[in-house]
């Protein structure tokens, strides 16, 4: 899957950063074309979430990071699931005031003969002068470390 887009720009002095886009889903594995002994295709890996944009230079909250998904295996015997994408990092708060953005959640890996590994959560964004750091995104349901707290 493709990488998620970075969050949209904010106003130069004031304004909140946009959230990062979610990573594209990994491709689904193809069905086996031969007999039952032919393995099905594996799912593609999910794309990583985009980073949240930073808050305005003076005042503004950082945007949250996006997440991704993993593709599922198919066929007989079934293929393995693709890895889940990592969560994007949260954006930084404004220089005077603003909270850091939350880190994106890592995606659960796709299902199949072997489940795909889950992605890691993104790091929380930092506050600079006044504001709370963003909490790290959680890891995937099966595997994946949570992101660091801002």
PLM feature spans:
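Long, compositionally biased tandem-repeat segments
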Residues: 1-150
């Amino acid at each position: 899957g493709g990488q998620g887009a970075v969050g949209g720009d904010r106003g130069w002095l004031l304004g909140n950063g946009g959230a990062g886009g979610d990573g594209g889903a990994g491709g689904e594995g193809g069905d086996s074309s031969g007999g039952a002994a032919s393995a099905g295709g594996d799912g593609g890996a999910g794309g990583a979430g985009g980073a949240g944009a930073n808050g305005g230079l003076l005042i503004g909250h950082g945007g949250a990071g996006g997440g991704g998904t993993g593709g599922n295996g198919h066929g007989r015997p079934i293929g393995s699931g693709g890895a889940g994408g990592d969560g994007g990092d949260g954006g930084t708060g404004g220089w005077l005031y603003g909270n850091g953005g939350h880190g994106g959640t890592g995606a659960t890996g796709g299902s199949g003969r072997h489940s795909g590994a889950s992605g890691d959560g993104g790091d929380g964004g930092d506050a600079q002068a006044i504001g709370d750091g963003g909490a790290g995104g959680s890891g995937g349901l099966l595997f994946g470390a949570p992101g660091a707290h801002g």
